[in-house]
């Protein structure tokens, strides 16, 4: 049974286009299912976060990351008696707007889009689920519930100041109450994202031999995790020791979130989800001590992983891919795929063209972006380029 402050599918604010309710699935379950079946979700399989895909199949992709986030989010939501289906829907959709090549690709596309309103991956996720997915007869997008859209827009907190154009375009006609916090379910999805990437960046960095377990054992939280494993399992081999320490690290983060949220909810005594939205700060977050420890860990990862020479070289390569594809399609929109050329025929400004080109490039997988760059810019194939 969910708590009174949980989001209730029976009281959901509805969809942009009214639909008949399902006999067997709640409105939030339908949102989750539509996200899973979306083309943009499938493409996450070939989009990476730090390592570009052709550097190795082992490293996490946006898809595996999203699945891990959803698993963590459901665990936390269950412990707090929240709606797990809404939590999972937001968790699965939170990365839909990401470009190829992780944050490097986003930085490059954002630079290209600066004269045209910029690019923001969270706003792009809204654009995808409200406009760019075009499979249904009655509407563009996925026609998700207000609660899921709110969660995508505000899972990192209230949106204030300059609102990204892609989000503003939707919010101007369908108010998502951007100045308030999102539901507890959306907040859980956001913190689950933090838990998942802190955990798997450490794992992937070790796998890539960018740092050692001895170095990790000197970091906060992780020092206790490795010490406990060594005490319980002296002589454990390297791989099992690494796994046991990292799973404990994972558990520490999840337990910290749950325990702090329980205490915060006990103090606030929210009666409805409206009370969650009106709170003076996020309900779901890390404790101050754990947050400070994570800052130390993120600083370590920034220096040893994100600035690693091999990663820096790849970043330069993929930045060039985006920086050369964008002006190419701006100059030659006739080389966009047929369905995109139809959109171009209906526009009347350079800004509208840039946004179509941005939509197209941001939806590319790492592999396809490399192929298109080789074909269109160099007149070769990736195989020929690599020789």
UniProtKB/Swiss-Prot annotation:
Disulfide bonds listed in the record: none
Alphabetical GO biological process terms: dGTP catabolic process
Domain HD: 62-198
UniProt protein name: Deoxyguanosinetriphosphate triphosphohydrolase-like protein
Family label: Belongs to the dGTPase family. Type 2 subfamily.
Highest taxon of the lineage: Bacteria
Source species taxonomy: Bacteria, Pseudomonadati, Pseudomonadota, Alphaproteobacteria, Rhodobacterales
Region (Disordered), start-end ranges: 1-26
Ranges of biased composition (kind: Basic and acidic residues): 17-26
Molecular functions (GO terms): dGTPase activity
Keywords, ordered alphabetically: Hydrolase
InterPro entries the UniProt entry points to: dGTPase (IPR006261), dGTPase-like (IPR050135), dNTPase_2 (IPR023023), HD/PDEase_dom (IPR003607), HD_domain (IPR006674), PHydrolase_assoc_dom (IPR026875)
